[in-house]
Regions:
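Conserved aromatic
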Residues: 75-79
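N-terminal functional modules and adjacent low-complexity/disordered segments of proteins
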Residues: 7, 33, 42, 71, ...
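Short N-terminal "domain-start" leader segments
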Residues: 1-58
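Short arginine-rich
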Residues: 87-105
Length: 117
């Protein structure tokens, strides 16, 4: 994600956001991370509820998967920070998987896309 200033992020996630399984939802949208957060006793941890094999996980399954694999999207000091990050992540993933990938890449590169070609 381009700009996470002010979110108090403790640890960047360790999941490749651009190689996620794509799950078709009942409304026709695509889910790749479908995140949630929980407090692990130290930080608010944002985790996906879409498994690496493309299954939609219940909250308990997602938390169990985190403890089993150690994979997470981000760690934060507060629920509010985690929620703001999850919202930004959802919007970025939506643009990447459902929108114009060139526009998405251009935003990530800070508007330098046209200069590359």
């Amino acid at each position: 994600m381009k700009d996470n200033r002010g979110l108090g992020q403790y640890g960047l996630g360790n999941i490749d956001l651009y190689a996620r399984p794509q799950v078709k939802m009942p409304d026709g949208s695509i889910a790749t991370v479908r995140s949630m957060s929980f407090n692990d006793g130290l930080k608010e941890v944002v985790i996906p509820t879409v498994s690496d094999d493309g299954r939609i996980l219940e909250p308990k399954q997602a938390i169990d998967n985190y403890y089993k694999t150690g994979k997470y999207l981000g760690k934060f000091d507060t629920v509010d920070e985690a929620t703001k990050y999850a919202d930004r992540l959802h919007n970025e993933q939506d643009r990447y998987y459902n929108g114009n990938k060139a526009s998405f890449i251009n935003r990530l590169l800070g508007g330098k896309w046209k200069k590359l070609f």
